[in-house]
Curated annotation (Swiss-Prot):
Residues annotated as binding Ca(2+) 2: D365, D367, D369, R371, E376
Record keywords, A-Z: Calcium, Cytoplasm, Metal-binding, Pentose shunt, Repeat, Schiff base, Transferase
Function: Transaldolase is important for the balance of metabolites in the pentose-phosphate pathway.
Protein name: Transaldolase
Any GO CC annotation of this UniProt entry: cytoplasm
InterPro entries documented for this protein: Aldolase_TIM (IPR013785), EF-hand-dom_pair (IPR011992), EF_Hand_1_Ca_BS (IPR018247), EF_hand_dom (IPR002048), TAL/FSA (IPR001585), Transaldolase_1 (IPR004730), Transaldolase_AS (IPR018225)
Length: 390
């Protein structure tokens, strides 16, 4: 009998939400997505150290021996994203998503320039535009940047999408793909209402993606919908038929191990809802975001989390560059990661405190108890971690 993964793949493009090349080979998805948190997690795997070193050496050579470490690391971030992307494209038949620095999320011009640079690096490596999606946060500034890039033939994936206003603005901008975050929407509602769980059809994240999908298909928008950030199998199966679903290796394993029957829930040829079409300009976008506390909270939180992941990766790259060049290593990088995330200082990090991505949290949470201990973080990042107390 066909597995849940086989059945889902027959009606939806399954995308691997990971930077781990071995996990991608294992599940043979058609696309793959990356972000700074996933690259950070992959960078801890010894097998990929040569890719990191390649990027650092290339960046040093590009900007010169006299350049400060910070400049080399900044250049290497783009190189690393593209190097991992190139390796992923050797495995998946379609596309990889590579993310713009989240710290540029409110700067249209800087986002445009970064998108152009990333696609140029791919082009220089012989990768055509149609195999790459540039991931940009769904701020108004990010959406406007994507609109410009799309007109230049650079395809974009608008991420950190939580509100309907964001979705409509993205479609009107003609972006290639949007990534509404199912699980993070659920997290917010659980925290806000005090409910422990929601049945699949009542899951707020599922309802949000279903609404966006049906709206796009009803009014003929070409923008693809890729549900992301899943917490459980019910969320995934309730969105069977969505254009794409990007799924972590942990949940892909569960899908592959189940032979339960799957029915299609979303149908592009027969969308439901009949919602009135609207136009979203800057004023309406701001008004819709202001009226949607969940979308505002989660967008800001997501940008902050991805920004922190980039900063952590920068620390680790500086450490490695110092090792490669015979300099002094950064011995406190992992301690800084822990102290930064341990908001209440109780010696552990909960999922709510964690500023990075869910995929990294899951990878570090070795005993799957929903709490990261210093030992788990030490093992996960491969560095000594010493906590000091007042």
């Amino acid at each position: 009998m066909a597995t849940l993964l086989d059945q889902l793949s027959a009606m939806t493009v399954v995308v691997a939400d990971t930077g781990d090349l071995e996990a991608i080979r294992k599940f043979t998805p058609r696309d793959a997505t990356t972000n700074p948190s996933l690259i950070l997690a992959a960078a801890q795997i010894p097998a990929y150290q040569s890719l990191i070193d390649e990027a650092l050496r290339s960046s040093r050579k590009l900007i010169g021996d006299a350049a400060p470490v910070e400049d080399v690391v900044h250049e290497a971030l783009d190189e690393i994203s593209v190097i991992f992307g190139k390796e992923i494209l050797k495995i998946v038949p379609r596309r990889v998503s590579t993310e713009v620095d989240a710290r540029l999320s409110y700067d249209t011009d800087a986002t445009i320039e970064k998108g152009r640079k990333l696609i140029r690096l791919y082009n220089d490596a012989g990768i055509s535009n149609d195999r790459v999606l540039i991931k940009i946060a769904s701020t108004w500034e990010g959406i406007k940047a994507a609109e410009v890039l799309e007109k230049e033939g650079i395809h974009c994936n608008l991420t950190l999408l939580f509100g309907f206003g964001q979705a409509v603005a993205c479609a009107e901008a003609g972006v290639t793909l949007v990534s509404p975050f199912v699980g993070r929407i659920l997290d917010w509602y659980k925290a806000d209402t005090g409910r422990d769980s929601y049945p699949g059809p009542e899951d707020p994240g599922v309802i949000s993606v279903t609404r966006i999908f049906n709206y796009y298909k009803t009014y003929g928008y070409k923008t693809e919908v890729m549900g992301a950030s899943f917490r459980n199998l019910d969320e995934i199966t309730e969105l069977a038929g969505c254009d794409l679903l990007t799924i972590s290796p942990k949940l892909l394993d569960q899908l592959r191990e189940s032979d339960a029957s799957l029915s299609q829930k979303l149908d592009a040829t027969n969308p439901s809802g009949g919602e009135e079409q609207i136009h979203v300009d800057r004023e309406r976008f701001d008004a819709m975001m202001a009226a949607d506390r969940m979308a505002t909270d989660k967008l800001g939180e997501g940008i902050k989390g991805f920004s922190k992941a980039i900063e952590t990766l920068e620390h680790q790259l500086a450490h490695r560059l110092a090792e490669l060049e015979g300099g002094e290593a950064f011995r406190h990088a992992v301690q800084e990661i822990f102290m930064l995330n341990d908001m209440n200082g109780d010696g552990c990090i909960t999922r709510d405190e964690w500023l990075g991505s869910d995929a990294v949290f899951d990878a570090l949470d070795l005993d799957h108890d929903g709490r990261l201990t210093p030992e788990e973080v030490r093992k996960g990042f491969g560095a000594a971690l010493t906590l000091t107390t007042a």
